[in-house]
Amino acid sequence: MEEIQRYLQLERSQQHDFLYPLIFQEYIYTFAHDHGFSRSIWSKNRGYDNKSSLLIVKRLITRMYQQNHFLISLNDSNQNPFWARNKNLYSQIISEGFAFIVEIPFSIRLISCLEGKKIVKSQNLRSIHSIFPFLEXNFSHLNFVLDILIPHPVHVEILDASSLHLLRFFLNEYCNWNSLITPKKASSSFSKINQRLFLFLYNSHVCEYESIFVFLRNQSSHLRSTSSGVLLERIYFYGKIEHLVNVFVTVKDFQANLWLVKEPCMHYIRYQRKSILASKGTSLFMNKWKCYLVTFWQWHFSLWFHPSRIYINQLSNHSLEFLGYLSSVRMNPSVVRSQILENAFLINNAIKKFDTLVPIIPLIASLAKAKFCNVLGHPISKPVRADLSDSNIIDRFGCICRNLSHYHSGSSKKKSLYRIKYILRLSCARTLARKHKSTVRAFLKRLGSELLEQFLMSEEDVLFXTFXKASSTLRGVNNSRIWYVDIISINDLAXHKSKF
């Protein structure tokens, strides 16, 4: 990494990194191979060892030096002897090497940024559960939210022209762009092998959109935003700041039109493609931002994005579906007794409270899709391998149950998870009974329901049962919301399909 960093410092021109010469360096493909990018190329029934893999890379680099293969049309490349043999293999090597190369400057910027802000253990700040305390502190005072699904890009701009020609070359040679953007089961092997490059291109599109959006938000808000990019350890992408004011208005009309969307209190959060824009403004104000974003995508990114894909919802009467939770702002009534001299009276106060619930119906649909139950929520048995032991089966079901309890530990009403635990518990019992060719009742009678419940006990239940006698302060642990710092991705069963 030090050698790459020295090269980039020497070859940097106008703050843009020209990565084209790195394609001809052998150590780049070695790094890509060591990081697991090329594992699928060498290890799937090809019989290549490390020595022969290095020889293939050397031969590829030698042939790239001999001829200019990056400006060839698709028809000419079909007649080129360079691609006549091992065409797919060479294309995969270049594509995966390219995926590693384009991440180098952004990784270096991320490391230097973390060192500059003296953030040592930033991995503890990656938890997606850290979003919900932010929502609790801010969303209870807001009125409307925009539910936004960020569209896929039609094209992605790369400032390095030489690398852009290379990217265009192997994309034309290896697959079509539509299958890359919307990979299917029967798509080309590019989308299956090199998902890292696809994610890099899409994230670069999203980060360019967000960099411009944050700039516009800062211009229209009295509050200065705090970047969460370092806290989430995202790769930084720097757009062209000098063209931000020309997104869809001219420089002359920029400040004149910006007052239409000015708001002193706005908040923006995103996870993957789902983003939320919340404000204290009115419905008319949110409609202005909706039109603003649609025009922004159409003019700056050449994307057709229908306005009906952005939903305007009021927090007081709508539940926000985000990160596997149903979040809403509800009124929490409280009665206060006040007494002045001989007169006593009651005061009714309604306090806004941010509430997080478990979406039971979508979660049951996810369990039904995973064959734990039917569409009505009735538990069913799962076919298992005959060589699995009973303890292994119980441990697998228990792990699923504990992971769900761990992820939904921030729910305001944890009793709603009892139905999910019941489905998993009975599905496990039916699976074991099917294996032993017995009935569920007979199997539970022989095994003992206490043993099965011990495996399916959630983390909070274990904590309460272990320390309940030692401390009375833990008695409310089952009713309190707990946010963990070790959850960096959404649970697979909780990642059900939303209305988008």
From Swiss-Prot:
Entries under Pfam families matching the protein: Intron_maturas2 (PF01348), MatK_N (PF01824)
What is the protein name stated in its UniProt record? Maturase K
Record-linked InterPro entries: Domain_X (IPR024937), Maturase_MatK (IPR002866), Maturase_MatK_N (IPR024942)
Keyword list, A-Z: Chloroplast, mRNA processing, Plastid, RNA-binding, tRNA processing
- The gene name on file is matK
Q: Which PANTHER family match?
A: MATURASE K (PTHR34811:SF1)
Chief location of this protein within or outside the cell: plastid
Please explain the role this protein plays, according to its UniProt record.
Answer: Usually encoded in the trnK tRNA gene intron. Probably assists in splicing its own and other chloroplast group II introns.
User: A Gene Ontology biological process annotation?
Assistant: RNA splicing
GO cellular component terms listed in the entry, alphabetical order: chloroplast
Subcellular location field: Plastid, Chloroplast
Q: Does the keyword Amino-acid biosynthesis apply?
A: no
What family does the entry list?
Answer: Belongs to the intron maturase 2 family. MatK subfamily.
Q: Which molecular function GO terms apply here?
A: RNA binding
